[in-house]
């Protein structure tokens, strides 16, 4: 599997993926720091909540759509799928490598954005943001990303990059309303795109040490973790089984 991941990394050389992963967090967090350093009245909690609401509900769904879609689009451009068929390359490992590489790319992008935000605010504005707390929230949001990454990979293989990006935009709209407002209090568990923003808020709640509040939402926290793992496993298994038995479709026109 390591060799498959190394190949995936080499394929992204001089591609859009590396620009997305390494440049977008610099731009987004840089803009956030540029705005926040002049707002002395904003609390650390507001910074935390605002950043992860925007990042997890907006950036992640669209980013997942672009990353998974573009990875498959590049394979179509290079005719790699026909090479896989003719050379007998392990399809299961190939599919899993795409999934793992997508997760790693999203994780690097998220952690980089958080580190830039925290360092920028701590150096330029003396906010004393807890980097450990923000990194923990990033990890939780990435766990919440697993199901939608598995879903988008299936969409990308079957329908192409355009459909994956379109689904990401729809996911962003749904996550914004369902994941960040009271509208989705009773239906968020049916919307995987809301999981990242819900998961990212857990570390702050845990740090509050409010036993009464924690007791009220402990079941939701457990459900979030359970759904993230189970749904990602289900969609990943479905994707692997489908890809292992399918005829490759040409999506170069998408």
Regions found by a protein language model. Name each.
Residues 41, 46, 171-250:
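Terminal transmembrane helical anchor/hairpin motif
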Residues 70-104:
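Helix-loop-helix units of permease transmembrane domains in multi-pass membrane transporters
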Residues 1-25, 248-253:
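Aromatic- and glycine-rich beta-strand/loop motifs that create alpha-glucan
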Residues 20-25, 161-180:
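Pore- or pathway-lining transmembrane helices of multi-pass membrane proteins that form conduits
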Residues 66-71, 76, 153-156, 161, ...:
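Transmembrane alpha-helical segments in integral membrane proteins
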Residues 24, 28-63, 68, 97-161, ...:
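Secretory targeting signals
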Residues 16, 20, 93, 98, ...:
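Residue-level recognition of membrane-helix boundary sites in multi-pass small-molecule transporters
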């Amino acid at each position: 599997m390591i060799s498959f991941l190394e190949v995936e990394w080499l394929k992204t050389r001089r591609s859009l993926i590396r620009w997305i992963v390494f440049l977008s967090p610099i731009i987004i967090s840089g803009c956030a720091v540029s705005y926040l350093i002049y707002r002395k009245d904003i609390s650390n909690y507001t910074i935390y909540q605002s950043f992860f609401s925007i990042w997890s509900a907006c950036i992640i769904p669209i980013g997942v759509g672009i990353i998974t879609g573009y990875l498959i689009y590049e394979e179509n451009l290079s005719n790699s799928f026909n090479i896989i068929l003719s050379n007998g390359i392990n399809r299961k490992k190939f599919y899993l490598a795409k999934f793992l590489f997508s997760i790693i790319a999203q994780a690097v992008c998220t952690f980089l954005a958080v580190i830039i935000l925290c360092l920028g605010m701590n150096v330029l504005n003396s906010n004393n943001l807890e980097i450990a707390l923000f990194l923990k929230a990033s990890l939780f949001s990435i766990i919440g990303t697993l199901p939608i990454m598995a879903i988008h990979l299936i969409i990308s293989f079957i329908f192409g990059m355009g459909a994956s990006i379109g689904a990401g935009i729809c996911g962003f709209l749904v996550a914004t309303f369902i994941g960040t407002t009271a509208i989705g209090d009773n239906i968020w568990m049916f919307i995987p795109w809301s999981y990242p923003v819900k998961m990212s808020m857990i570390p702050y709640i845990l740090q509050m040490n409010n036993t009464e509040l924690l007791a009220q939402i402990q079941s939701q926290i457990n459900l979030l973790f359970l759904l993230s793992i189970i749904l990602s496993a289900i969609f990943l298994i479905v994707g692997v089984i489908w890809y292992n038995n399918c005829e490759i479709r040409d999506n170069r026109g998408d």
